[in-house]
Amino acid sequence: LTEVETYVLSIVPSGPLKAEIAQRLEDVFAGKNTDLEALMEWLKTRPILSPLTKGILGFVFTLTVPSERGLQRRRFVQNALNGNGDPNNMDRAVKLYRKLKREITFHGAKEIALSYSAGALASCMGLIYNRMGAVTTESAFGLICATCEQIADSQHKSHRQMVTTTNPLIRHENRMVLASTTAKAMEQMAGSSEQAAEAMEVASQARQMVQAMRAIGTHPSSSTGLKNDLLENLQAYQKRMGVQMQRFK
């Protein structure tokens, strides 16, 4: 889910709204936000976001938040995910859907989806959103990340074939998501030891920094320092605590 958060946030323009969306995504993925109707209403009225970005976010929320089976599909998401009404996009979307149906892993689905255009990918999301077809949640997330990568690429004006993610926007967002996750883990580790106050301090500073960077918008390379500082602080803290946690490398 960290990966999904990273890709989705990389297509949201920097500003206070980005920090707010990041918070909503975090809550949704942590199972804290269970009112899909209210969430969609909130999303629909957000300024600045393009219809497609709203459509993708709406799709993510719908996949993640448990809801009653009969809940109405939202028109603003359907309109955004119709591939501009282009029948070619629809044809390609159906072909892609058939492949995704056989693919159950996130990375497999993402790999397949990356060879399609953003229009076909959006149409394919529309198919799934409108319940015309069903794929595993993993596959759907792979499709979402591939779409965001295509969009971030065109925003970045880089059309070279991307095998690994070289896009600075996505790397930057990934560092910020990692920093938030690390901060959260530090707070959980802190417990009641005397170093707890220090850990909480470092974690809350990191949180504030990430929020500020999202709200103000910074150069993608600026987040490298943030991640390094955080990891250094975390490792120093772990040494003193006598804990070695591998997952933050």
Swiss-Prot record:
Its main location: virion. Residues 1-161 are annotated as: Membrane-binding. Signal peptide: none annotated. A motif (Nuclear localization signal) lies at residues 98-102. Pfam families: Flu_M1 (PF00598), Flu_M1_C (PF08289). Keywords: Host nucleus, Membrane, RNA-binding, Viral matrix protein, Virion. It is found in: Virion membrane; Host nucleus. GO terms for molecular function: RNA binding; structural constituent of virion. Homodimer and homomultimer. Interacts with NEP. Binds ribonucleocapsid by both interacting with genomic RNA and NP protein. May interact with HA and NA. Cannot bind NP without genomic RNA. Most abundant protein in virion. When expressed alone can form virus-like particles in transfected cells. Belongs to the influenza viruses Matrix protein M1 family. Plays critical roles in virus replication, from virus entry and uncoating to assembly and budding of the virus particle. M1 binding to ribonucleocapsids (RNPs) in nucleus seems to inhibit viral transcription. Interaction of viral NEP with M1-RNP is thought to promote nuclear export of the complex, which is targeted to the virion assembly site at the apical plasma membrane in polarized epithelial cells. Interactions with NA and HA may bring M1, a non-raft-associated protein, into lipid rafts. Forms a continuous shell on the inner side of the lipid bilayer in virion, where it binds the RNP. Determines the virion's shape: spherical or filamentous. Clinical isolates of influenza are characterized by the presence of significant proportion of filamentous virions, whereas after multiple passage on eggs or cell culture, virions have only spherical morphology. Filamentous virions are thought to be important to infect neighboring cells, and spherical virions more suited to spread through aerosol between hosts organisms. This is Matrix protein 1. It comes from Influenza A virus (strain A/USA:Texas/UR06-0195/2007 H1N1). The lineage of its organism: Viruses, Riboviria, Orthornavirae, Negarnaviricota, Polyploviricotina.
